[in-house]
UniProtKB/Swiss-Prot annotation:
GO CC, one annotated term: cytoplasm
Function: Necessary for the introduction of cis unsaturation into fatty acids. Catalyzes the dehydration of (3R)-3-hydroxydecanoyl-ACP to E-(2)-decenoyl-ACP and then its isomerization to Z-(3)-decenoyl-ACP. Can catalyze the dehydratase reaction for beta-hydroxyacyl-ACPs with saturated chain lengths up to 16:0, being most active on intermediate chain length.
High-level lineage: Bacteria, Pseudomonadati, Pseudomonadota, Gammaproteobacteria, Pseudomonadales
Family listed: Belongs to the thioester dehydratase family. FabA subfamily.
Keyword Lyase appears in the UniProt entry: yes
Protein name: 3-hydroxydecanoyl-[acyl-carrier-protein] dehydratase
Associated pathway: Lipid metabolism; fatty acid biosynthesis
Domain of life according to the entry: Bacteria
Chief subcellular location: cytoplasm
GO molecular function, one term: trans-2-decenoyl-acyl-carrier-protein isomerase activity
Enzyme Commission number: 4.2.1.59, 5.3.3.14
InterPro entries for the chain: FabA, FabA_FabZ, HotDog_dom_sf
Species: Pseudomonas putida (strain W619)
Amino acid sequence: MTKQHAFTREDLLRCSRGELFGPGNAQLPAPNMLMVDRITHISEEGGKYGKGELVAELDITPDLWFFACHFEGDPVMPGCLGLDAMWQLVGFFLGWQGLPGRGRALGSGEVKFFGQVLPTAKKVTYNIHIKRVLKGKLNMAIADGSVSVDGREIYTAEALRVGVFTSTDNF
């Protein structure tokens, strides 16, 4: 069976309901916390480290929920949502690889913010470069990522770590 290498908004919504990778396996959050509209490319090869990459997008409109509350009179997308989107995508990669369990963000190395997403923006693009996938007692991916708005890079994150767990009882 050939793996799918791009995913629509409807595919991602199916993933948020647990219908894409099967019950008990990696899910994306449901809207409003789903910070991705489509994955335009996912591969087990390529990227900066030759171990896999993802490219995904979020369409920006002035009526997105976070602009009304962050900040009143000075609307800007919270940087933590861009960081969470990168974790979401690393977890999606693990599910796409067929690794069982529920995804959990486990941390990151250095995160830098040097730009912002305003209501006038059109599109956010996420680029994820897989550095390593650990398979065994702990199934985990480590990746570097970046967030761009309308073609300009505005955030970077190193060593994004996400694991998948068949039980989160002792987490």
